[in-house]
Amino acid sequence: MRYAITKSLLSANAKSTFTGIRFGAAELYGVIEGFPEVLDCIACGQRRPGDADERVLLFLKMRNGSNLDEAVRSRVRNAIRKQLSARHVPSHILEVADIPSTLNGKRIEHVVSDVVNGRKPRALGSSIANPECIKEYEKFADLDKRIAVNKL
């Protein structure tokens, strides 16, 4: 199955335990497909020290001319809550410039997960279409610190 807009593959093999339930990121992708202002997305889990479960981070690549503001975040949260459940709602919905993908258009979730969890990404090889975009995800490894600083 392919994401209607970018034609990237919808299937997501990564399954994690988020908020006490086990689900795959593809469940979120199906909901996000209904947002015309979103060009593509990727989701992964982030486990902080001391957390029993991972929290969900949802990254959105917005269509040109669209911005991820609080109104869009609210609509995304409400759609996920309605179509899936309240436990599927991501902890954070964040805007990125690009989504890492393979040459055939499949999202590379494990790389994003490695980076946002402060780990060195697993071997990328030559199959990644846009390796330069991975650097942007490094700033989300210390997301709680960044949020605290912004609130000051």
State the predicted function of each range.
Residues I42-R48, L57-F59, R77-L152:
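Conserved C-terminal "lid"/linker of ANL adenylate-forming enzymes
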Residues I32-C41:
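Short acidic amphipathic segments
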Residues A25, Y29, R73-R77, E109:
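Hydrophobic face of alpha-helices
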Residues M1-E33, F59-E70, L84-H92, V115, ...:
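Adenylate-forming
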